[in-house]
Amino acid sequence: MPKSIIVPAGTHKPIAPFSPGTLADGIVYVSGTLPFDKNNDVVHVGDAGAQTRHVLETIKSVIETAGGTMEDVTMNHIFVTDWANYQAVNAVYAEYFPGDKPARYCILCGLVKPDALVEIATVAHIGKK
């Protein structure tokens, strides 16, 4: 099964050995996405809603670069550092998935940088385009 590496224009260089996304058999796998700028610094420190929006916009750019849309998302893996931010994360998340909701789970955990409040990894089925 051949795969394609998906790297949207302007994407920051990952801080570890991974690609922002891969496409194989019409499925886009988006790596865990953190609220980082192009220098791998955390953006919107202390604002879980703004960090969630930044993360989802980054995920959207990976999926669109692969030829899909957010409507193609079938699964999200969400990681948060504090349950107090859960409502803010969900409020922004709902804006990106207004219709049929993809499957998901949410885990409370520490993240790679202390100021990062949310990380999301995504799977989207875009078909053979």
Swiss-Prot record:
One of its GO terms (molecular function) is deaminase activity. It comes from the Bacteria. The keyword Hydrolase applies. The keyword Nucleotide-binding does not apply. GO terms for cellular component: cytosol. Gene3D superfamilies: RutC-like (3.30.1330.40). CDD domains: YjgF_YER057c_UK114_family. Its EC number is 3.5.-.-. Involved in pyrimidine catabolism. Catalyzes the deamination of 3-aminoacrylate to malonic semialdehyde, a reaction that can also occur spontaneously. RutC may facilitate the reaction and modulate the metabolic fitness, rather than catalyzing essential functions. Belongs to the RutC family. NCBIfam families: RutC. This is 3-aminoacrylate deaminase RutC. The lineage of its organism: Bacteria, Pseudomonadati, Pseudomonadota, Alphaproteobacteria, Hyphomicrobiales. The gene is rutC.
